[in-house]
UniProtKB/Swiss-Prot annotation:
Protein name stated in the entry: Small ribosomal subunit protein eS6
Stored SMART domains: Ribosomal_S6e
Keyword terms of this UniProt record: Ribonucleoprotein, Ribosomal protein
Gene Ontology MF terms in the entry: structural constituent of ribosome
Family, per entry: Belongs to the eukaryotic ribosomal protein eS6 family.
InterPro entries, per database record: Ribosomal_eS6 (IPR001377), Ribosomal_eS6_arc (IPR020924), Ribosomal_eS6_CS (IPR018282)
PROSITE patterns assigned to the protein according to its UniProt record, in alphabetical order: RIBOSOMAL_S6E (PS00578)
Entry's Gene Ontology BP terms: translation
Organism expressing this protein natively: Methanococcoides burtonii (strain DSM 6242 / NBRC 107633 / OCM 468 / ACE-M)
Top-rank lineage group of the source organism: Archaea
One Gene Ontology CC term in the entry: ribonucleoprotein complex
Classification via PANTHER family: 40S RIBOSOMAL PROTEIN S6 (PTHR11502)
NCBIfam families from the UniProt entry: PRK04290.1-3 (NF003294)
Length: 135
């Protein structure tokens, strides 16, 4: 069974993190960067999420340019996972493929389709009033 941390970034407000396991997690396996997922898998009914990246259990980032789910050592000059310190410098780095596999730990997503309800309302924290602490 796969366990994922799903990071949902809402461009309008802020970022939320969900832990999913079991059947919900299996819906992400085999999906690639750029594909859409129903938000109901993380409890956000009516929302549409797009996979933007992620990291595996060793911390290697997923690259949208590499096909498949495996880890590869590639020569890169700039892009996901490496920023060159000078022009023309290239380096051999480990990167993960763009496909979600069971050994991925974190999946980054962004909201592309919105529901009538705000995410705060769905999660139950939108209408609460916080009292000032007693002095």
């Amino acid at each position: 069974m796969a366990d994922f941390k799903i990071v949902v970034s809402d461009p309008k407000t802020k970022t939320y993190q969900f832990d999913i396991t079991g059947a919900e997690a299996n819906q992400f396996i085999g999906r690639s960067i750029g594909q859409t997922v129903d938000g109901a898998t993380v409890g956000l009914d009516g929302y549409t999420l797009t996979i933007t990246g992620g990291t595996d259990n060793s911390g290697f980032v997923m690259s949208p340019t590499l096909p498949g789910p495996r880890r590869q050592k590639v020569l890169i000059a700039n892009g996901v996972g490496y920023s060159a310190v000078a022009k023309g410098v290239r380096r051999r780095k480990f990167l993960r493929g763009s496909e979600v596999a069971p050994d991925i730990t974190q999946i980054n997503t962004k909201v592309t389709g919105y529901s009538d309800k705000a995410i705060e309302e769905i999660l139950g924290g939108g209408s609460e009033e916080v009292e000032a602490p007693a002095e």
